[in-house]
Amino acid sequence: MVLIIEIIKIGQIGPIGQRGQSGQRGQSGQRGQSGQIGQSGQSGQSGQSGQSGQIGQIGQIGQIGQIGQIGQIGQIGQARRTGRTGRTVHRRMLQASSSFNISPDISICRRATRNMGEEERPLGC
């Protein structure tokens, strides 16, 4: 009888082991999640602004230099305006062609000299 009572008393000491639950304080290690601040490294994506280098493609605007071919229109005007001799037509067309490095247009030459005889037409017409 005496032994049983002592065993029961010793068993009551067991609940003191609940103090071991204070080990939950170890969960404060979650503070280590503050390492997520390292995600601010995503700001490195601002390097995409480097794509602004595509502006260099604007250099294709240099193709506008083809507008210089509009000088051919000048040949048409000069050929039509001259109603004089075929030599005048020929000279004016050669002036236009030499300044733009292009050959005289035969059809323009023929139209401008259609009222002339074969002898009066300049060479190439």
Swiss-Prot record:
Instruction: State the residue spans of region: Disordered.
Output: 15-57
Localization, UniProt? Secreted
Per-repeat ranges for G-Q-I/R/S: 11-13, 14-16, 17-19, 20-22, 23-25, 26-28, 29-31, 32-34, 35-37, 38-40, 41-43, 44-46, 47-49, 50-52, 53-55, 56-58, 59-61, 62-64, 65-67, 68-70, 71-73, 74-76, 77-79
What processes does the entry annotate via GO biological process terms? cell adhesion
Per the record, its GO cellular-component terms are:
extracellular region
Give the domain of life: Eukaryota
Under InterPro entries, the record lists: Collagen, Collagen_Structural_Proteins
Q: What happens when the gene is disrupted?
A: Impairs the formation of the hypoxia-typic morphotype, increases surface adherence and reduces the hypoxia fitness.
Alphabetical keyword list: Cell adhesion, Repeat, Secreted, Virulence
Induction of expression: Expression is regulated by the hypoxia responsive morphology factor A (hrmA).
Which intervals of the chain are annotated as region 23 X 3 AA approximate tandem repeats of G-Q-I/R/S? 11-79
Identify the Pfam families for this entry: Collagen
Q: What does the protein in this record do?
A: Hypoxia responsive morphology factor that modulates the expression of the subtelomeric hrmA-associated cluster (HAC) containing genes that alter the hyphal surface (such as reduced total chitin or increased beta-glucan exposure) and perturb inter-hyphal interactions within the developing biofilms, resulting in a loss of vertically aligned polarized growing filaments.
What UniProt notes about the protein's domains is: Contains a tripeptide G-Q-I/S/R repeated region and lacks a canonical secretion signal.
Q: What is this protein called?
A: Subtelomeric hrmA-associated cluster protein cgnA
In its UniProt entry, the species of origin is given as Aspergillus fumigatus (strain CBS 144.89 / FGSC A1163 / CEA10) (Neosartorya fumigata)
Underlying gene = cgnA
